[in-house]
Amino acid sequence: DYLYTLLVPDRASTVFPCFDQPDLKAAFNLTLEIPKEWVAVANAPLGKIIESDTSTVYVFEKTKPVSTYLFAFACGKFKVASQPTRYGEMAIYYRDNDSAKVNRNIEAIYELHTQSLGWMENYTAIPYPFSKLDIVLIPDFQYNGMEHPGAIYYRESSILLEGDPSENKLLNRANLIAHEVSHQWFGDLVTMRWFNDVWLKEVFAGLMADKIVNPQFPEFNHQLSFLLSHYPRAYSVDRTAGANPIRQELDNLLNAGSLYGDIIYHKAPIALMQLEMAMGVSAFQEGLRKYLNTYSMGNASWDELIDILDPLTSLNL
């Protein structure tokens, strides 16, 4: 009694006719006709609802330009909680029937999202770039999160925590939320031209998430945690004959799933942290601000980012 889209990397063409590649962005109009007892959420705000005896038609406003793999909607028998924020009304769609668990978690969910949004706005000097932000909690979702602009999906159990969660579980949830919020800028506002640069959006979202969350958990040794979580897994692959570069060529989008793995998620963060340390924090931030402004609502490659960063350092990037 619910359904959702998950179109990354090349499945949008199973929903509507399109060229399924990230550098062909478009603004989408979406209309859904669903059973009367269902609700629906999508990338853009709801424009109007048309009721009939047997169904409900949801007409959504036009989206900002987005890549096809980021187009999203979910509908079904979801419960909805809503709260006004400085970013407009923020709704949480969830399925869990444990009202006590939901009530224990809901304020933290709102707070973590608004904190992350505010931090990203301050760091990038770019206001939240989409029309609204809703949260969709899906049981048994394939990933911990997916950064659809305006409608972030999460695995429900990763966000609605049980009982009295440990500090480590609270840190993991905060980091997950910060990661997906960071993607609204790195990945959604500016998207890779092709999936050979998919690592770029992932590594920036991870870097930003650490910057957002780590000060909130001062009892952790975050540098030690970074070393222990990334270096062993990066070396375990990098020392083998089957190691691959961080940036890999991709001839066929059907093989995009092969790009994900320990090299992207564990070696790439080490390389990017070294780049930030070598350039200096301020120069690195200045470069990222210029990168996001230059390619806003468009696409960029690693080479185009390097062209922006290179003049800001004495290093020969």
Regions found by a protein language model. Name each.
Residues 60, 92-317:
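Hydrophobic alpha-helical and helix-loop surface patches within well-folded domains
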Residues 1-131, 260-262, 277-279, 295, ...:
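Acidic/His-enriched low-complexity segments
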